Amino acid sequence: MRIEAATETTRELLDALTSLLAQLNPQLKPLTMERLARVIGDPATTLLVVRDDSRIVGAAAVLVYATPAFVKARIEDVVVDEHSRGKGVGEALVRRCLEVARERGAEIVELQSARWREVANRLYPRLGFELRESNLYRLNL
């Protein structure tokens, strides 16, 4: 297993992420090459992929940004292919996300996980995350 930052917009990456994101949320619109290029080109974002041999089996995005209060990191879209789950891929991926956040100067790291993702919700406290009481608001533009 190898975890690396995606630095090029390729058809292989697009196809792998499209498949992975559909497993994360089947209602998401398909990823486009333009959106993928925007993610990879965004200096605040590090897109990590997990390869098993040459196949991409997992991914996550780490966003680091500054506010007046903190330099924050958010871990987004953590997903491991259903055939690779239970092998420590997700834990290794999140640990690498935390390394990226530290390397980029983050003081705190936040992530959000759906309640039904039971395995993920057991993993995060083991890695030091604390469940927070919060009202999360969203507005689709």
Language model: regions and residue ranges:
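A conserved beta-turn-beta hairpin within the catalytic core of GNAT-like acetyltransferases
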Residues: 65-75, 85, 132
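Conserved acetyl-CoA-binding loop-helix of GNAT-fold acetyltransferases
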Residues: 80, 86-99, 122-126
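Conserved active-site alpha-helix within GNAT-family acetyltransferase domains
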Residues: 91, 103, 115-133, 138-139
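Active-site rim helix/loop that mediates acceptor-substrate recognition in acyltransferases
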Residues: 28-49
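Helix-loop element at the rim of GNAT/NAT acetyltransferase active sites that forms part
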Residues: 18-30
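Conserved beta-strand in the GNAT
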Residues: 49, 55-64, 74, 79
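A short beta-loop-alpha structural element at the N-terminal edge
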Residues: 1-17
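Conserved GNAT acetyl-CoA-binding A-motif
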Residues: 101-113
